[in-house]
Amino acid sequence: KGFSYVRAEYPIAVKRFQIAIDQAKEYGIVGKNIFGTDFSFDIEIRLGAGAFVCGEDTALLESIEGKRGQPRVKPPYPANAGLWQKPTLINNVETYANIAQIILKGSEWYSSIGTETSKGTKVFALGGNVNNIGLVEVPMGTTLREIVFDIGGGIPNGREFKAAQTGGPSGGCIPKENLDVPIDYESLKQIGSMMGSGGLIVMDDTKCMVSLAKFYLQFTVSESCGKCNPCRIGTKRMLEILERITEGKGEEKDLEKLDKLAKNIIRASVCGLGQTAPNPVLSTTKYFMDEYKEHVIDKKCRTNECKKLAKITINPELCKGCGLCSI
C-alpha cells in the first residue's frame, strides 16, 4: 500500500489527486488484482497539519501513524523499520514521477539529461524579485543565471540581482558571483546551499541579508519540534543574536558566537531540520559579511529594512507632524 502525504492547506491539490486516484482505480491501474493479476496496490491520501518538521522522513511516518510529528532516532532506517515498523520506501513524489518515464524511454535516455552526478530534471518554484514567477522544469546543471534571466525574465524595475535562496527556509543564499554555477546537488552543497524541494527565491539590491537570515531563522525556530536541545535551544539563541544585531545592539563577538553556534547545531541535531536550520546564517555571513559588520560596527542598514537602524532627518520647514517617523 502507498500513502501520499499532503498538507491540509493544499485543498485543491488534494482534490485533484483524489480524482486521479479514482480514475486510476477505474482503469484497473490501482486497486485489487491489477490487470487481472494477483498483485494489489492501493494509494491513500493522508493529510498533514502543516508542520515543517514533517518534511523529515521519519517525522512524516510518525504523522501518518497518527502520532506527533517528531523524527525518530536512526538507525533503524525506514527501509528496515518504517511505517508501523514495516520496511518502507519513502521519497518525494517528484522522484516517483520520473519512474514511468524511465521505464518507457530507458535509463540511457534519462542519464543523458543533467550532469555527471545529478541526472534528470528539477522543478523549481521560482519567486521573489523576478519578472516571471511560477514552476519551471530545467535539466540538472542549468545555471542560476539561465533560470533567473532567461526563464525568469530578469529583475523588475531595473534593479540589480543580489542573491537567490534555494532549498526553502533551510537553504543557503547564493550571491551574484555564483550566478554561473550549475544547479545540481553537489554544486549547491559546495557553495553552502541545498536543492531541497526546489524553492528558488530571487532577491534584488533592496534586500537586507541580515534581516533575511533573521526571517528564515524565525521560521525554523517556530517549526522546531523541540525533541533535541541543539535545535530547540540553539536556534533560539542564534535568533536572539540576530535580533540584537538588527536592532543596533550587536557586538563584534556576536558574529563569532553565531558561527560557533551554527556549527554546533549542525553537528549535534537529531534530524535534518536542525542540521540545516543555520544554512541561511552561514551562507549570508560567508558572502555578505560586510553587511553584518555595517550592522554591528556602524549601526547601519544599507537598505533601511532594519527600522531600528534607520536614521531619519526631519526638515522643520517641511514637517507636517504626521508622526510616521516615530513608528
Regions found by a protein language model. Name each.
Residues S63-P75, E177-M194:
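Active-site loop ensemble at the mouth of alpha/beta enzyme cores that anchors a bound cofactor
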Residues R7-P11, L47-C54, Q85-N92, I133-V138, ...:
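Hydrophobic alpha-helical scaffolding
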Residues K15, I19-G36, D180-P316:
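Ferredoxin-type iron-sulfur electron-transfer modules in oxidoreductases and energy-metabolism complexes
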Residues F3-I21, F41-I43, I155-I191, K286:
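Terminal amphipathic helices with adjacent charged low-complexity linkers/tails
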Residues G141-N157:
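Short amphipathic, charge-patterned alpha-helical segments
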Residues V14-M140, G152:
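Hydrophobic alpha-helical positions that pack around
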Residues K1, L144-I147, E160-F161, S224, ...:
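Extended, hydrophobic alpha-helical segments in both membrane/secreted and soluble proteins
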Residues S118-N132, V138-M140, L144, R302-I327:
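C-terminal accessory/binding modules appended to enzymatic or scaffolding proteins
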